[in-house]
Amino acid sequence: MDDVSQRPLLAAALAAFGRPAAIIDLETTGGSFDTDRITEIAFLRFDGGTVTPYHSLVHPERPIPPFIRRLTGIGDETVAGAPPFSALAHELLPLLRGCILLAHNSKFDYTFLRRAFARCGLPFAAPTLCTVQLSRSLYPQFYKHSLESIIERHGIAAASRHRAADDVLAVADYLETALREQGAETFAAHAHHLLQPKLPPALPAALEEQLYALSDGCGALLWLDESGRPLHLAAHRHAFSEAARRLAASEQARAAASLRFLPAAGPLHALTLKAQLAAEYGLRPSENPQHAAAQQDFLTVRLRSGENGCVQAKLERLSDGRFAEQPYGLFPNKKAARQALVEWARGNGLCPQRLDILPDGYSRDTPCPAALSGGCACLSDGLEAHNRRTAAAARLLPVAGWGRAHALEITETDADTGVQLSFACSGGALHLPDGSWYFDHSLPALIKEKFKKERHNIRVCV
């Protein structure tokens, strides 16, 4: 690859970000993040006044399809002697970790790169700047923003297309041209707006190092102060991106001294790890506010013994946290809960008066209205028998968003490492390995999403 020190405008613009930046391009065996692999990697790394080029073919450890060979010129024989990504990973990681990655369609290159590192057991994450979006933002008068269109529009000399090294140089030349045409101030404004995630202000060296050592996948992240006391705890789907956004937006977050991260196979696993960290540090939900004003309140049913020894169904707010006893049912509001309780009692032949779920307007001393019609359990069951049937039927209380299901086994698989874990959920809560139950305000929406998108990973137990 050419020395690009002749691109002074680009070098200055990237230096203004205050951290290294790399213009990167990958060639792959196809477009699937799950099944395709990298065949070529190239980048230009800008760090202050130094520009470091890198290029390598990569053995994908699978056949290269004919279409890709025709498109890129890279076939099986081209990569026959090339190293697999696993042999390059430890060389690449220190060059790219902590960099801003610029790429034409950055989601493609970033995701392939992140997942290639993950398959090697190496967490990798980076802020990204998509040069397709940057072209659209800087040149809105044009309709096409593919690299071919940009090369033609700006008269950029390109030795070939769909080869990583040549594409990197073409993107670098385009950015230098855009800086010359638009000016550094305009370029910087658009670039900073499009950068994802936004960069936090200057951080203590140790905290910055820990931030850039995070993965951009699922996990539980604990923020600690200088004394090792917990400041904030959250489960994440994209740990690095979400942590960086928090640091950019919150001065309080920037007061953290260190981070502790537990990677997860999926979002349910992340919630169990969040529960684990909360227990380890003795952190109560009230000490870890998670935008409580925006959270939906959920209700559940707890079985409580009344004055006469009769088991009653009591509606209670289901708060985030760990519980010794299982919650029964999950309801978005009191109206839905009361209606569900009445239908549940009727369907299971239980007495609404004994359960203390009579509608408003009925006092406890009022004769059971169901008994007056001659069809209530209080006419046939003794108290102990009714209590036993109530306890047995409690698991059949409905759960919002689960349809007719009451208890589930949900499997999560890490697509990169192959780690597979199963989780028991019942009554709207997670059953933890120690026998306790855990609820988080994000859990109902998460399981509803899994019903919609991952039904094949759910086994309905009850």
Predicted regions and their residues:
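A short, structured active-site edge motif that brings together acidic residues
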Residues: 126-135
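Conserved non-catalytic scaffold segment of RNase H-like nuclease domains
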Residues: 1-126, 140-162
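Acidic two-metal-ion nuclease catalytic site recognized across multiple nuclease folds
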Residues: 1-13, 176-221, 225-227
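Amphipathic alpha-helical transducer elements in NTP-driven molecular machines
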Residues: 65, 86-89, 144, 165-168, ...
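A residue-level signal for conserved active-site and pocket-lining positions in enzyme catalytic cores
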Residues: 73, 92, 102, 167, ...
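Conserved catalytic/ligand-binding micro-motifs in nucleotide and anionic cofactor chemistry
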Residues: 204-462
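Acidic, divalent-metal-coordinating active-site segment for phosphoryl/phosphodiester hydrolysis
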Residues: 163-177
